[in-house]
C-alpha cells in the first residue's frame, strides 16, 4: 500500500512540529505511524522535470532507527526534501501555504500569511519544544 503524505497539516490534527527553512511548522505524522505500527517503508520520491518534457523520479528509502519517535521520523522526511528544495526552489509548489501557523512571540520571520494559534503552541509543548 502507498499514500502521498501531506507535509503540512493543522496542529489540531494528527501532527507534530518539524523545522523547515529555519521555521517551525506542523506536519503530518501519519507516515511515521504507518512506519512504526505496520513496519512500513517510507520512500521519499523526488521528481525532476527533463528537457524532453518527461519527468525523472528518484526514490530514496528513508532509514529510521526502530526507536525513532514520530516527530523524529517526520523531521527526517522533511530533512530529506529540504536540500533539493533549496537547490531548485522553482520546482516546489510555493503557492501552497506550508507555514500557516507560527509560535506566539516568535522572533523568526514567517511568511505574511502565518498566524499565531494556541493549538500550534500546545503542539510545540507536547512535542517538547516550548
List the model feature ranges, each with a label.
Residues 1-130:
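Non-catalytic C-terminal accessory region of glycerolipid acyltransferases
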Amino acid at each position: 500500500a502507498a499514500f502521498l503524505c501531506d507535509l503540512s497539516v493543522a496542529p489540531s490534527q494528527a501532527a507534530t512540529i518539524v523545522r523547515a527553512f529555519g521555521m517551525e511548522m506542523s506536519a503530518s505524522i501519519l507516515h511515521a505511524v504507518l512506519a512504526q505500527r505496520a513496519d512500513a517503508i517510507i520512500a521519499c520520491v523526488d521528481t525532476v522535470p527533463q528537457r524532453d518534457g518527461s519527468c525523472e523520479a528518484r526514490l530514496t528509502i528513508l532509514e529510521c532507527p526502530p526507536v525513532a519517535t514520530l516527530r523524529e521520523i517526520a523531521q527526517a522526511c522533511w530533512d530529506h526534501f529540504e536540500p533539493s528544495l533549496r537547490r531548485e526552489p522553482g520546482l516546489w509548489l510555493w503557492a501552497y501555504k506550508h507555514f500557516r501557523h507560527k509560535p506566539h512571540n516568535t522572533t523568526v520571520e514567517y511568511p505574511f500569511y502565518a498566524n499565531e494559534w494556541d493549538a500550534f503552541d500546545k503542539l510545540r509543548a507536547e512535542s517538547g519544544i516550548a
